[in-house]
Amino acid sequence: MTQHVCLPSDISPEQFLSEYWQKKPLLIKKGLPQLVGMFEPDDIIGLAQDEDATARLISENNQQWSLKTSPLTAKDFQKLPKHWTVLVQNMEQWSPALGNLWHAFDFIPQWQRDDIMVSYAPSGGSVGKHYDNYDVFLAQGYGKRHWQLGKYCDQTTQFEAGQPIRLMNEMGELIFDEVLEPGDVLYVPTNLSHYGVAVEDCLTFSFGFRRPTPLQLLDSLADVATHFDDLAIPLKINQPAAVAGELSIASIQDIKAQMIALLNSELSDEIITQAISETVSKRQYELMLPDAYADIDEIQSALAAGAVIRQDMSSRIIFTQTETDSQTQAKIYVNGCAIDADDIPANAQSLLIRLANGESVDEQILQAADVETDIICDWIENGWVVIDYPEEIIG
């Protein structure tokens, strides 16, 4: 099935990635028309009060801001000031139809996906002037929001003191100043200051993309390295003349040189690949698994009726490929864990890779792949895939 791409008709994915990605903003008029009418404000206010939701309630009164985080209750929404916003994270967990809209951004590998956040605000509501350490596509799903973009920021950017959220006093010269209507999408690069104010009751959906930090990778490297016995052997250090209490610079440089040599070794390539893959495939939020077991007969009947299997977009499924003896070997990672090749037949691994690449699998494809339905049941119960029934398929 051909997927809609969230880009202007005159800009290709290759052009966007070379000219706009992490460089400059882009307005995409009617970039996600499928989003219009998918949710109403009351849907989000109700969801924010669910005990399993990750939500924030931000309000402003006389330039003093307040923040309340989950759990939220109906009482929290009583006697609010005029300007307030409620935000709910991880929306793909709650709506597979919304999660499928990630495919509109398949020109960016899914290992960079963060989550879909929604913000509801009545007229005048906002979360203030700020910047984010990630790239985001701001999609208008309901009502209108006025967006302003300003200067690029960094770690030296100053925030207002005495506020519970990161707020900037000013954004410098504005480079964008427009109102987004339902279906419109605004791409905002990482570290670009932005300020969105509801023109009327509105819902804005944020499709965030994030890269790992060096600290996350170092932590993962240390964890992965503990499983390699070769790294438990002490280093051999050339011993220069030194007084009893001194750790000499020469010894430090010797250890450093050996560590650099290790980082450039084939063993390190394996460790680093696994550490990076596990880090970027981890979910930020706890996965909500299905309440009921998947039924083989029901799945087979659904597929026969025209249903398809798709990746559950609240899970992260990625794969790496390496060349070994002139053969390409794939390694699959799901939600931060490497999948042992012995646990899944080769044909099922190939099917899982196709699902990770955004394909929908129907009955004919499943039969041709010769993958048993009980394997699909396991994937459903683990939250890896979902069944899209005919009436729920998004065109």
PLM features per residue range, with description:
Residues 1-20, 32-184, 192, 197-241, ...:
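Active-site region of the double-stranded beta-helix
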